[in-house]
């Protein structure tokens, strides 16, 4: 059984992330969405909240698991007996960064492969940071994040606008 891992902070999960998750789940037997615990970074949502939101939006996909991890991704991969990392790419700058990370991961464990998936063009501009910015300034995020998590974002940002 081939298990792949799609790591990220997902703060919050976007429609771009969800697009990669759904597509990646079709090319492996099991996909683990691995939510990074970064104690040096204060996110909008806690790790537990992010895990719960991703579970909510992927609940109809039986081969998707959502877990958190801290430390080296390679250690998490070994623990989960996975040899495949899934990474989504939006732009050339994403590729440059992710290529370096893939080389480092391969240096740490030559058995690990990184598979790059191109983001759907309609999400190529989208990032969790831009979602937070748009929401904080009262913009509409309906086309940016899954509908199921809009109430979570509204509550965190304490926003009253209807089309957030």
UniProtKB/Swiss-Prot annotation:
Keywords: ATP-binding, Coenzyme A biosynthesis, Cytoplasm, Magnesium, Nucleotide-binding, Nucleotidyltransferase, Transferase
Predominant cellular place of this UniProt entry's protein: cytoplasm
Protein name: Phosphopantetheine adenylyltransferase
Assembly notes: Homohexamer.
GO molecular function: ATP binding; pantetheine-phosphate adenylyltransferase activity
Coiled-coil boundaries: none
Lineage: Bacteria, Bacillati, Bacillota, Clostridia, Eubacteriales
Catalytic reaction equation(s): (R)-4'-phosphopantetheine + ATP + H(+) = 3'-dephospho-CoA + diphosphate
Residue numbers binding substrate: 9, 41, 73, 87
Family in the record: Belongs to the bacterial CoaD family.
SUPFAM superfamilies membership: Nucleotidylyl transferase
Record-listed ATP binding positions: 9-10, 17, 88-90, 98, 123-129
Iron among keywords: no
Domain of life: Bacteria
InterPro entries: Cyt_trans-like, PPAT, Rossmann-like_a/b/a_fold
Cofactor(s) recorded in Swiss-Prot or TrEMBL: Mg(2+)
